[in-house]
């Protein structure tokens, strides 16, 4: 037993002596040096990449205002977002994929422009609509039921889910609903502009008025609220008056709305950026002055706005309500301006006011008061 221990001791001593040879020491030092160099190299590479990314981000940040100024049409595309044709691959010529008892047709508001429209029947007409053609559907606009012309916001088409869901609710409540894709949107030809969108909606409104024997009112959402008040004011200037106007998530004017955009807010601290933004909008002839329009608009107005709207702040809807109310009082009129605020706790945000269970009651009550005037 002791002999084994002695032999193990001699082996350990030999190993220890071997470990301490100059060649092995040099090898270990070389390995440690290589590891440190590798670690230092990794740190240097990480710092270099971080600097490059930071430089790229700074370049992009600085170049955005310059590029938009040099190419002002870019801002127009950002505002209209008409090239984002959600839902992709939707066949707008077959509305039955999205809505029951809905016909698709096109109108030509001016030469070279064709706009797509869906006409959704009130639920009460569905049974009679079985097997009927487009002419019969058009004739139903004269059945005495109210007609809503829905003017949607930017991006997407009339087939976008929150738009379709609103149409379903309004149809169930007994309204004819006509959903328009402005020029450049969906299956409509042409390029969007404020003047063009207004022309398209005005043409549809006048076309419907020729068919209908009941109230015809405009329902604008987001970008569409500017189109709505433009149309209503244009009609008023021609000696007529839109029966009623519903503004869902409206903005005061496009300049103010653009200032509130998250991208714009990143630049607001830069001197001169705000005036540059307004100048570019002016170059694009994009104003959509809801505030100015409501100062003179005589049509009844209902404003719907959610407190938690993360696109257009609720205070803009409140400001428009105050403007319209003051204008109404100046005309010694009553009952023509109403506003409904949806609490933030409901979570409707910008696109989901249609989910409110009292929506049709609110709209129906408003229209009933309009009829009594």
Residue ranges and their predicted role:
Residues 42, 110-207:
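Membrane-embedded segments
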Residues 220-224, 228:
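Gly/Ala-rich beta-loop-alpha elbow adjacent to hydrolase catalytic centers
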Residues 296-297, 303-305, 309:
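Short beta-strand/loop motif that positions the catalytic acidic residue
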């Amino acid at each position: 037993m002791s002999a084994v221990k002695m032999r193990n001791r001699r082996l350990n001593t030999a190993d220890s002596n071997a470990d301490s040879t100059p060649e092995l020491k040099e090898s270990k030092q070389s390995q440690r040096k290589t590891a440190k160099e590798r670690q230092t190299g990794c740190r240097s590479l990480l710092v270099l990449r971080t600097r490059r990314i930071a430089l790229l981000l700074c370049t992009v940040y600085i170049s955005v205002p310059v590029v938009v100024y040099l190419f002002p049409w870019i801002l127009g595309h950002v505002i209209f977002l008409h090239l984002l044709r959600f839902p992709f691959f939707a066949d707008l010529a077959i509305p039955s994929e999205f809505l029951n008892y809905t016909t698709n047709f096109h109108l030509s508001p001016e030469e070279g422009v064709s706009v797509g429209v869906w006409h959704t029947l009130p639920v009460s007409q569905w049974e009679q609509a079985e097997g009927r053609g487009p002419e019969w559907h058009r004739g139903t606009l004269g059945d005495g039921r109210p007609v809503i012309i829905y003017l949607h916001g930017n991006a997407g088409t009339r087939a976008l889910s929150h738009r379709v869901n609103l149409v379903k609710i309004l149809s169930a409540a007994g309204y004819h609903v006509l959903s328009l894709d402005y020029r450049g949107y969906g299956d409509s030809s042409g390029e969007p502009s404020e003047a063009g969108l207004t022309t398209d909606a005005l043409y549809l409104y006048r076309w419907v008025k020729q068919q209908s024997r009941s109230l015809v009112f405009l329902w604008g959402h987001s970008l569409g609220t500017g189109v709505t008040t433009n149309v209503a004011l244009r009609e008023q200037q021609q000696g007529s008056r839109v029966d009623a106007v519903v503004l869902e998530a409206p903005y005061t004017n496009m300049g103010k709305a653009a200032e509130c955009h998250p991208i714009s807010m990143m630049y607001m601290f830069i001197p001169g950026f705000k005036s540059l933004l307004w100048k570019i909008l002016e170059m694009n002839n994009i104003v959509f002055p809801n505030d100015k329009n409501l100062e003179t608009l005589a049509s009844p107005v209902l404003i719907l706005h959610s407190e938690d709207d993360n696109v257009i702040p609720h205070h803009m809807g409140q400001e428009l309500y105050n403007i319209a109310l003051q204008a109404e009082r100046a005309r010694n009129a009553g009952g023509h301006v109403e506003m409904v605020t949806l609490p933030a706790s409901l979570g409707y945000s910008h696109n989901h006011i249609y989910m409110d269970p009292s929506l049709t009651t609110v709209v129906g009550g408003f229209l009933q008061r309009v009829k009594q005037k």
